[in-house]
Amino acid sequence: MATSPQFNFNNSPATNNVDHTKHEYQYNYTRIPPLAMVDTVPAKEDFSIAWYRLLVKQLKIIFVNTLITNRGNRGSKSLRDDIRNFIFESVCKEALPTQLNILGRVLQIAPQLLLARMSKDYREVDELLLSVIKDCGLSIFRDLLGRINTRLESGHPTGHVSSLNDYSKLLPVLDIPQFANTFLEDESFAYMQVAGFNPLMIERVSRKSANFPIEDSHYQAVMGNDDSLELALKEGRLYLADYKILDNAVNGTYSRYQKYLYAPIALFAVPKAENSNRSLQAVAIQCGQNPGAHPIITPKSNKYAWLFARTIVTIADTNYHEAVSHLGRTHLFVGAFVLATRRQLPDNHPLSILLRPHFEGTLAINDAAQRLLIAPGGAVDQLLGSTIDNSRVLVALGLRSYGFNGAMLPKQLKQRGVDDPNLLPVYPYRDDALLIWNAIHQWVSDYLSVYYSTNQDVQNDTALQAWAAEVQALDGGRVPDFGENGSIQTLNYLIDAATLIIFTATAQHGAVNYPQKDLMSYAAAAPLAGYMPASTLKGEVTEQDYLNLLPPLEQAQRQLNVLTLLGSIYYKNLGNYSPGHFPAQVKPLLDKFQKNLIQIEEIINDRNLHRPTYEYLLPSRIPQSINI
């Protein structure tokens, strides 16, 4: 058996460390029932000051953008005074007697901000917020942000838009995303299925479906008379995005607005092999699961009917993305492994050493999400299409239906029938993700082979087997379909399992988190809820019907602020481990991994010269862990 100076499988001196951490890391199954989350986040799992520095920098930019939108821009000098005065009012006015100590402490922290003129880059705002975090604590920091946000929202624009240009007025400082200029194009709509914020939905069609009665006339109107449904089906060129998981969702409300969430079915096709452009094309949409209640809409339908139907698909996609692909299948998926690792593996166990850098900030951000984002009255409740209770159920359903062994990237692609580049030539997410998956798999294989020579070594590692048992236990991580008959029997399985955990914590999260800023923050391009029923399509759809489907301006501003923040914080990057984290014998293996990542960066950059840019899986843009 191969061992390292750090760990001996038969006599670990760190067993007491595990016993102690079990008391610190307790499970809670009531946050988002029945999922496993941490009960109380241990102090050592909190974010670093470097992370908070990135956070407050983005908060400042969003704050300035919102202040100008809601209160006007009277020029740079006056704006600096406006910012200073606004924060002073937020801190000082209407302070409750019980909060006077907070006021006094904040005034002591940053008198230069409140009493002096502000610099051109507003860096005093950064200094104030960081000082509050360091000297007053997170509760006071959150209180201050709450005060600022409440006062800031008092002047926000309201109501439905009369033109798409109205949404651009919400970005006087922030850059208007490039996607805002292309999202109306059918090519862009289809491209989102393979390189968008949720490139995980489409499945190859193997047979016609009774609840989606598309006919050749629908198909040929888009793909041409020299093609047919039967031929496309036979050649494996038909792909479906079916949002049936959203069927019967309970529509939410916010303020005076009724919101809607839909369960559409969208058909896409790849042109025949002789075509020079074989990018995915949108063919037809049915805006619900019942064909009797929902007509089939195609690009040849009324212009605004098609745009309305497309938007319904996008709304379903954003809701599935946030609840299932993002929160459920990355954040909470990884969270269960953080807890089991902390509770069962000594700090000097080789698997713990390998995984821990990919867990930094995960328990803290998951706890913040359940307290702030998916709480009643939080951003999810305000912005997404269904009720908060329905959204939480969707998160749980999405994760509980995501079996671990079937979640391996190659298996996922094969199960959906999208693994063959000859059938689906243009799929940037697939192509780039496989590069990262294979590089991580090689690194994990090289690393674990230092410590385990045979399958017997794996089976005899009692800490590892305890970890595997807790990961799947009802009173543990509750991860479905984990292991080989309830344990880990082979080195190959251990390598695959560790690869999936690291891939999910890095590349997969990067692929679904960072498009929130570029592709989802501009509400017209990616609405988080609908504001008109799908039954509108039974009549003659007008431009104003389409505009009324989109979020009203106050909701659009909230969406802009939340998703810009979530998609802007990059903290550490894949493969960049702290010096000395691994023993010397591992360094050549790590060097090899890092060189592979550099080569992958070059390959993806070259690919982007020949396709619409897809950068979310560039190694330099993949964070080391889920921390936002």
Predicted feature descriptions by range:
Residues 1-628:
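Long, compositionally biased charged/polar stretches
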